[in-house]
């Protein structure tokens, strides 16, 4: 039995998902697989999602099964991030960009790390922009 993504709180329509809004639970019927949680961060829901509701692919804008496979998405700034700011989840989103930056699977690892320069809205985070990122 694989876990699915379940709403950990009421998520209003058009809200960009953050890690604290989601949890992994084994539910029937299955929804979006729990291992997709890092890729869902920054994606918007297209309807209000009540607490405890299983997230289905059609509830998340631009979510298609398969397009969130690892390595496709990069971490992108969700806002202007001033120099020396410690990163938080709300500052980052996952997007398919070219050239590729830090993989979206790394978002949780980036939390608390500082940027060594100003990062603009929609700018791709590159490894050399984050202090002590390896």
Curated annotation (Swiss-Prot):
Subcellular location: Secreted
Expressed in which tissues: Detected in blood serum (at protein level).
All residue ranges annotated as the AFP-like domain in the record: 4-63, 74-133
Signal sequence, start to end: none
Site for Important for ice-binding, residues: 9, 14, 18, 44, 79, 84, 88, 114
Keywords linked to the UniProt accession: Antifreeze protein, Repeat, Secreted
Protein name, as recorded: Ice-structuring protein RD3
Keyword Repeat: yes
Sequence similarity: Belongs to the type-III AFP family.
InterPro entries, per database record: AFP_Neu5c_C, AFP_Neu5c_C_sf, Antifreeze_III, SAF
Span list, region Linker: 65-70
Organism of origin: Lycodichthys dearborni
CDD domains the record matches: Antifreeze_III
Major localization listed first in the record, in broad terms: secreted
Functional summary from the UniProt entry: Contributes to protect fish blood from freezing at subzero sea water temperatures. Lowers the blood freezing point. Binds to nascent ice crystals and prevents further growth.
Lineage: Eukaryota, Metazoa, Chordata, Craniata, Vertebrata
GO cellular component: extracellular region
């Amino acid at each position: 039995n694989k876990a699915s993504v379940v709403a950990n709180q009421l998520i209003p329509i058009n809200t960009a998902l953050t890690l604290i809004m989601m949890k992994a639970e084994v539910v029937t019927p299955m929804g979006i697989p729990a291992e997709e949680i890092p890729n869902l961060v920054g994606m918007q829901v297209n309807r209000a999602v009540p607490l405890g509701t299983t997230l289905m692919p059609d509830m998340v804008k631009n979510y298609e099964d398969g397009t969130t496979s690892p390595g496709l998405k990069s971490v992108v700034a969700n806002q202007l991030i001033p120099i020396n700011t410690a990163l938080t989840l709300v500052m980052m989103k996952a997007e398919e960009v070219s050239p590729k930056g830090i993989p979206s699977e790394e978002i949780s690892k980036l939390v608390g790390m500082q940027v060594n320069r100003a990062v603009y809205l929609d700018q791709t985070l590159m490894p050399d922009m984050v202090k002590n990122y390896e």
